[in-house]
């Protein structure tokens, strides 16, 4: 995932000294690591590595010690695109990538710049892109629907590779023998049911893909092939259905499955020793092993790979130094734990993920006292071993987190979904502070890493204990299991001796509530433990979900059930709690759901729950099933006031939803989405020091970016504060407990922070920046200061080096909006974007467009149509200039992202001023019409090619 913007370059025009981290714009903070899909070492420069990750595309120039994002010119769900990344072995600066909408991209400068080749496939059709060794410009696509495709023009076009591959069978992996590039092996993606027509899993070609023959089959279906590696002496190794297979004749026939416990049924990656035929490295769910007898037996190589609960990182990529084994260096890509390096042929490992921002952070909490300022960040949605919980330290509010480390000693979790600090235990410092974390442990078959998903630390996160006594058990051997535990709250008056009123000052607190998937009883068709309660600080738990609807028609396709997600507690009367639920049902079997779902309230400490959802939007055709409630927030000063977010998850892309508000304890709800353009709100947060200040984060995509929103009036109106934020926004929010101007967000690329600067008109440009604009801060010369006009924003242009520059070096531009239809009175996130960040904009003459003043980006709230003037102070645009737009040609469609001519909707009305006509849901806006907002990015540009005929 790439950041949506490059820089807000105006802050230094009015500030002296170094800027605080995230001042006025979102800044990446770490922690680092995460899912690695592809990993390559440059054959020409072994210190250069490339990684395709869930967080995007990264390069290292120092052997993996540090990593830098390399995405200039890329767009289209790059976290997905990391699956399809390749390097040209003969031209090591040439890379290819298939983005999330199926477009082939190429870089010829080591990833510094990317451009489309012009070829595309359907979204998610490409599982792998493979360079053909022995020549430049030849590569292959491994597809879901069309077998193996081959290109001889560096990705500009592809054709079918040859005959013999089964029609309609998805392929997942292709390996080419570097010693004989005509010999190739293709593996299928896997099938989980009987398919007697297609039982072969690996296909061999000895003529460069002109023809194929099946060489490895099963009794009744094709299996899943995740890796194939050619070795010395005709040996080939393959990971097939999580098992190891070996061929002694170059893939013509196979032996297997090989190996016994613990590596059977756990293998994802193989890498043959290029010099020793019987030696192979084996990676998978149990870490890394090496076999020296052709896969008959193996030895674990997990020193340094243990990440949590005694479990090693799951290895899905094994990369060797080009001169291995003379240079005994190896790198590993893992499922959830980033990249590891060994200088000793795997004898020991060290993490090498600094800068690799691909951690999926779903939970945040902060501790502060005079000696310690610490952030806890939980890794979400992991089903393989991950660090699970990180702790970071900084020098104080707004300063960068200079160090992150796992905080998971004895923590039996693979993922963390909530972190809660007991405030009554803070007085003794971090070392005696009690923390709770919830999430999920290892799934089956990781029998040695299963527990109930609730954890407690008595020493500030230094060590952890699982606290799941009383939870239902399953499995063999039995272990506590209630699925994912998503949220946990504390009763603030549940200490041993509570005061007459108000929260306890000393603790620890004893009454805890949590929400989880719960336990389904197949015999009775009932669910329990969706709400959990403990009265002894987590030492034991009881089910507390009476009144939460039981499944309907539990044994039929018409089954309906509810999942309990958020929970909040009334701090003034802790007997009162609220939960939000999400409905599960088969839309193909039911015309409309009938189960009660939405918000429920308990007034007796969770003993009973009552439906409390009047006014929340319902599923189509339903009277009782509200849209999915994914977050809740309560006003600590007035607990009758709550907010919730609802999303229609039954529709792909969460096409409808928003924020709702109640002032009577949930008896009635009304929409509170004024200013919210995102429909998929995943987090709500009330600033505890200013309960009228709220934050919300909305998910999105590159072509319809998500945002973080702020309301200063209790949710009556919202505005975006999203400059620099990743396109898919955030799933966790945290206000700094010392300085509420500092806000943190958890995303799929780690933690991001922003230090909010005064911005009276909420247009995204700090007041001090607008006050320094031309004409004494009146950039549009209308007699009113720009800093006081929500529809006017003035700031300096972006700089090439990414550093803020004074106005003497980077002159100002001004955005001013005139409504045509709709209110169109509020500009948001007005910013400058460095044009080259989007890659080359190539004219019809083959040369690049030049952007002397870079790009202007802004969003207009509550708007159907508007005129926008862009005044670039001091500029003089000749007749050779036109207006260019970067964004989707079809609003919201990532497949149409790119550079476009916008001159038909733009007029130059003065030497330095352009006037744009913009319409909601039309060309020139990222947003689809349903957003009722216009998001534009573009600027004046000139192609030198227009002068070639001798005319201006």
Describe the role of every protein-language-model region.
Residues 838-890:
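Proteolytic processing hotspots in large secreted/extracellular or virion-associated proteins
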Residues 28-42, 71-88, 118-132, 164-177, ...:
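Short coil-to-beta transitions that initiate beta-strands within beta-rich domains
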Residues 93, 182, 328, 433, ...:
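Glycine-aliphatic tripeptides that mark coil-to-beta-strand junctions in extracellular
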Residues 728-758:
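Blade-level signature of beta-propeller repeat domains, shared across WD40, Kelch, NHL, RCC1
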Residues 55, 101, 145, 190-191, ...:
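Residue-level signature of beta-propeller blades and closely related beta-rich strand-turn architectures
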Residues 56-59, 103-106, 147-150, 200-204, ...:
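A short loop-to-beta-strand structural motif that recurs across blades of beta-propeller domains
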Residues 755-808, 944-952:
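Extracellular calcium-associated, cysteine-rich motifs in secreted modular proteins
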Residues 43-46, 87-92, 131-136, 178-180, ...:
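Residue-level detector of Asp-centered blade-edge/turn motifs that repeat once per structural unit
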């Amino acid at each position: 995932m790439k950041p949506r913007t490059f820089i807000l370059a105006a802050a230094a025009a009015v500030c002296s000294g170094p800027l605080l981290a995230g001042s006025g714009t979102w800044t990446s903070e770490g922690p680092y690591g995460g899912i690695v899909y592809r990993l390559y070492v440059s054959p020409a420069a072994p210190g250069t590595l490339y990684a395709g990750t869930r967080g995007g595309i990264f390069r290292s120039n120092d052997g993996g010690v540090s990593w830098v994002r390399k995405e200039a010119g890329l767009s289209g769900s790059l976290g997905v695109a990391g699956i399809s990344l390749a390097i040209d072995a003969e031209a090591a600066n040439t890379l290819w990538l298939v983005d999330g909408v199926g477009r082939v991209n190429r870089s010829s400068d080591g990833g510094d710049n990317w451009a489309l080749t012009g070829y595309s496939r359907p979204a998610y059709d490409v599982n792998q892109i493979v360079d053909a060794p022995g020549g430049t410009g030849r590569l292959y696509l491994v597809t879901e629907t069309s077998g193996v495709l081959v290109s001889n023009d560096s990705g500009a076009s592809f054709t079918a590779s040859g005959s013999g591959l089964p029609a309609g069978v998805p392929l997942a992996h292709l390996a080419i023998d570097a010693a004989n590039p005509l010999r190739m092996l293709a593996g299928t993606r896997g099938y989980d049911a009987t398919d007697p027509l297609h039982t072969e899993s690996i296909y061999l070609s000895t003529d460069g893909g002109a023809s194929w023959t099946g060489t490895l089959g099963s009794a009744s279906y094709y299996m899943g092939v995740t890796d194939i590696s050619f070795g010395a002496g005709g040996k080939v190794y393959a990971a097939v259905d999580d098992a190891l297979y070996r061929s002694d004749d170059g893939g013509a026939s196979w032996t297997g499955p090989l190996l016994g416990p613990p590596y059977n049924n756990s293998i994802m990656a193989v890498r043959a020793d290029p010099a020793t035929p019987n030696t192979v490295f084996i990676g998978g769910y149990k870490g890394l092993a090496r076999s020296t007898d052709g896969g008959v037996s193996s030895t674990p190589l997990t020193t340094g790979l243990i990440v949590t609960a005694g479990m090693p990182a799951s290895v899905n990529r094994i990369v060797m130094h080009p001169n291995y084994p003379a240079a005994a260096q190896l790198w590993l890509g893992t499922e959830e734990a980033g990249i590891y390096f060994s200088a000793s042929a795997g004898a020991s490992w060290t993490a090498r993920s600094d800068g690799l921002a691909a951690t999926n952070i779903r939970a945040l909490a902060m501790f502060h006292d005079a000696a310690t300022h610490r952030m806890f960040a939980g890794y979400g949605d992991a089903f393989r071993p991950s660090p699970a919980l990180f702790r970071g330290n900084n020098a104080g509010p707004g300063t960068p987190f200079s160090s992150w480390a796992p905080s998971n000693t004895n923590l039996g979790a693979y993922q963390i979904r909530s972190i809660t600090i007991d405030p009554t235990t803070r007085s003794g410092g971090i070392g005696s502070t009690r923390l709770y974390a919830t999430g999920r442990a290892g799934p089956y078959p990781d029998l040695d890493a299963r527990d109930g998903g609730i954890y407690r630390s008595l020493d500030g996160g230094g060590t952890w204990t699982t606290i799941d006594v009383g939870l239902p058990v399953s499995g063999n051997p039995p272990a506590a299991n209630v699925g994912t535990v998503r949220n946990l709250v504390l009763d603030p008056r549940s200490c041993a001796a509570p005061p007459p009123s108000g929260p306890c000052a000393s603790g620890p607190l004893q009454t805890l509530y949590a929400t989880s998937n719960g336990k389904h009883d197949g015999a009775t068709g009932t669910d329990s433990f969706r709400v959990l309660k403990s009265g002894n600080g987590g030492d034991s738990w009881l089910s507390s979900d009476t009144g939460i609807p039981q499944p309907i028609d539990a044994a039929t396709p018409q089954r309906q059930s509810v999942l309990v997600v958020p929970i909040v507690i009334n701090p003034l009367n802790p007997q009162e709690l609220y939960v939000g639920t999400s409905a599960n049902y088969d839309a193909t079997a039911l015309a409309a759901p009938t189960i009660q779902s939405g918000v429920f309230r308990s007034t007796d400490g969770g003993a009973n729950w009552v439906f409390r959802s009047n006014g929340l939007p319902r599923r189509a055709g339903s009277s009782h099933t509200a849209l999915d409630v994914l977050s809740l927030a309560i006003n600590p000063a007035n607990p009758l006031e709550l907010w919730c977010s609802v999303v229609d998850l039954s529709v792909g892309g969460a096409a409808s939803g928003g924020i709702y508000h109640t002032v009577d304890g949930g008896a009635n709800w009304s929409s509170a989405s004024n200013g919210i353009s995102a429909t998929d709100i995943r987090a709500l947060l009330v600033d505890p020091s200013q309960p009228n200040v709220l934050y919300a984060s909305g998910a999105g995509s590159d072509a319809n970016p998500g945002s973080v929103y702020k309301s200063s009036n209790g949710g009556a109106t919202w505005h975006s504060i999203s400059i620099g934020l990743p396109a898919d926004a955030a799933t966790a929010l945290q206000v700094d407990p010392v300085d509420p101007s500092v806000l943190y967000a958890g995303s799929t690329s780690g933690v991001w922070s922003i230090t909010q600067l005064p911005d009276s008109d909420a247009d995204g440009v700090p007041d001090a920046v607008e006050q320094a604009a031309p004409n004494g801060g009146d950039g549009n010369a209308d007699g009113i200061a720009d800093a006081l006009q929500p529809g006017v924003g003035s700031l300096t242009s972006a700089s090439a080096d990414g550093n803020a520059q004074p106005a003497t070096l980077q002159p100002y531009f001004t955005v001013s909006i005139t409504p045509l239809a709709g209110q169109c009175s509020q500009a948001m996130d007005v910013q400058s974007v460095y044009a080259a960040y989007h890659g080359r904009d190539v004219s019809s003459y083959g040369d690049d467009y030049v952007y002397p003043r870079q790009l202007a980006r802004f969003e207009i709230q509550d708007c159907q149509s508007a005129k926008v003037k862009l005044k670039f102070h001091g500029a003089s645009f000749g007749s050779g200039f036109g207006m260019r737009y970067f964004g989707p040609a079809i609003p919201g469609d990532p497949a149409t992202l790119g550079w476009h001519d916008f001159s038909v909707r733009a007029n130059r009305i003065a030497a330095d001023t352009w006037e744009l006509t913009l319409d909601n849901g039309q060309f020139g806006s990222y947003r689809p019409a349903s957003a009722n907002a216009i998001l534009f990015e573009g600027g004046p540009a000139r192609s030198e090619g227009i002068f070639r005929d001798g005319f201006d």
